[in-house]
């Protein structure tokens, strides 16, 4: 489960910018929902990818969410430079039991990010720019503990092709959010709606 791919597109929906949904530079998007609903409800106990920024990486994550650390994968990108201050912070988070992932790295960035990549559990690769066969050889030799994830998958056809090729552990992109209209079924209300209603009813101000 990934909060990164669940984010709203503010270019297409500019009105969302006025909701204060992501206010607070040190607040990490997604942790409040994990704290409120629990990992079992959100992802059936599986790992959850949570994006962090070059500022929120220094936040007290445990204070924002007390979920099991090993179930939370903190996702960084190339806006976090591979300098000592950030490498040390990533080491601290790793020692606390959190898992780490990185995305938006070009092949030319790999060498500069060597110390960062040593700490990563996952790396999200742009499947349109990086050949998986070469990536498997590179990471297999230098970073054998990293699991490869295919990113930026737009269509179900691309997903099926990449799955057939193999080499990736996870797949991320728009493909799984496209509605499939084959057949008909009844969809149960989202459990989160019940939790929200219960919280409102139990509120002292209700």
Model-derived features: positions:
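Short, well-ordered helical secondary-structure segments
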Residues: 37-39, 158, 188
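Bacterial c-di-GMP phosphodiesterase EAL domain
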Residues: 1-71, 78-88, 92, 199-206
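Conserved alpha-helical "signature site"
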Residues: 164, 174-206
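The catalytic core of metal-dependent phosphodiesterases that act on cyclic dinucleotides
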Residues: 66-177
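General structural signal for secondary-structure boundaries
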Residues: 6, 53, 130-133, 179-181
């Amino acid at each position: 489960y990934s909060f990164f791919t669940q984010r709203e597109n503010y270019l297409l929906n500019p009105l969302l910018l006025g909701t204060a949904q992501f206010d607070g530079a040190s607040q990490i998007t997604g942790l409040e929902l994990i704290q409120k609903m629990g990992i079992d409800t959100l992802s059936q106990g599986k790992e959850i990818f949570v994006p962090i920024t070059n500022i929120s990486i220094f936040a007290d994550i445990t204070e924002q969410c007390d979920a099991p650390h090993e179930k939370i994968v903190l996702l960084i990108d190339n806006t976090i430079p591979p300098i000592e201050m950030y490498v040390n912070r990533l080491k601290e988070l790793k020692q606390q039991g959190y898992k780490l992932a990185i995305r938006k790295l070009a092949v030319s960035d790999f060498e500069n990010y060597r110390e960062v990549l040593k700490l990563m559990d996952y790396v999200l690769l742009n499947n349109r720019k990086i050949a998986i066969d070469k990536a498997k050889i590179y990471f297999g030799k230098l970073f054998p503990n990293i699991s490869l994830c295919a990113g930026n998958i737009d269509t179900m056809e691309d997903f099926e092709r990449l799955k057939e090729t193999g080499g990736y552990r996870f797949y991320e992109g728009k493909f799984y959010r496209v509605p499939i209209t084959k057949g008909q079924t009844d969809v149960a209300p989202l459990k989160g709606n019940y939790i929200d209603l219960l919280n409102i009813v139990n509120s002292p101000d209700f």
